[in-house]
């Protein structure tokens, strides 16, 4: 629709997806699921909460309400908890499947504040990617889960998406794809 309405390029290398918080999770998930459409993915403070949901299921055998999401919300967003490991809603599953099928994985840019409550989740996902030699630019800088942080990170992310300008990658970890 947008390509026809606005005359956007239909080339994968010209098409990016990004988001923040749960939208960052959604951008990663959609960018991987629709890898034939998106050339790059940018996620700010991505809501990689599947780790907690799957951990809770393994630990307690049930999904419960917590301060961020109640059980019904979790199930509406992510589906049946017992299927999360092998569900297309799980970015790790999508990556594993793409690697098995030798499908090109879009480059990813992940950024997170060092005081963000999702820091460990983002580190875990970056580690997962790194262990599989999936290309990722990952940055941790001072900040928390708010617009002040995201506004500061927007310009470096856009420059990365467009392959333009100089960036301070002193804290970035760029992993080549083998």
Located regions from the model:
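Non-catalytic cap/lid and distal C-terminal segments of serine-dependent acyl enzymes
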Residues: 1-178
């Amino acid at each position: 629709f947008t390509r026809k309405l606005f005359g956007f390029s239909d080339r994968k290398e010209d098409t990016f997806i990004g988001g923040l918080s749960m939208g960052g999770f959604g951008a990663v998930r959609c960018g991987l699921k629709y890898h034939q459409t998106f050339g790059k993915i940018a996620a700010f403070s991505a809501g990689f909460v599947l780790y907690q949901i799957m951990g809770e299921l393994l630990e307690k055998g049930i999904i419960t309400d917590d301060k961020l999401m109640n059980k019904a919300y979790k199930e509406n967003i992510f589906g049946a908890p017992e299927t999360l490991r092998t569900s297309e809603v799980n970015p790790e599953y999508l990556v594993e499947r793409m690697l098995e099928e030798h499908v090109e994985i879009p480059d990813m840019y992940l950024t997170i504040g060092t005081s963000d409550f999702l820091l460990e989740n983002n580190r875990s996902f970056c580690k997962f990617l790194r262990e599989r030699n999936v290309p990722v630019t990952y940055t941790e800088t001072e900040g928390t889960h708010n617009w002040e942080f995201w506004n500061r990170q927007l310009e470096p992310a856009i420059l990365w998406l467009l392959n333009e300008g100089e960036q301070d990658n002193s804290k970035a970890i760029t992993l080549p794809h083998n």
